[in-house]
Amino acid sequence: MKAAELRKLTAEELKTKLVEQQQELFNLRFRHATAQLENTSSMGDARRTIARIQTILKEKE
């Protein structure tokens, strides 16, 4: 998700998205460990999205 799209969301929506992304990253790590993940770059994408959300949450404080 782009940062501009994330900035339009409220703090509560961002927190919800953050939890969803953290769960997605957990699932990706699990699939990677069990050799079921074909596209490993999706783990990096998830980490970057989490970082974007956390940064925008700090900006809104």
Curated annotation (Swiss-Prot):
The keyword Electron transport does not apply. GO terms for cellular component: cytosolic large ribosomal subunit. One of its GO terms (molecular function) is structural constituent of ribosome. It comes from the Bacteria. CDD domains: Ribosomal_L29_HIP. It holds the Pfam family Ribosomal_L29. InterPro entries: Ribosomal_protein_uL29 (IPR050063), Ribosomal_uL29 (IPR001854), Ribosomal_uL29_CS (IPR018254), Ribosomal_uL29_sf (IPR036049). This is Large ribosomal subunit protein uL29. It comes from Nitratidesulfovibrio vulgaris (strain ATCC 29579 / DSM 644 / CCUG 34227 / NCIMB 8303 / VKM B-1760 / Hildenborough) (Desulfovibrio vulgaris).
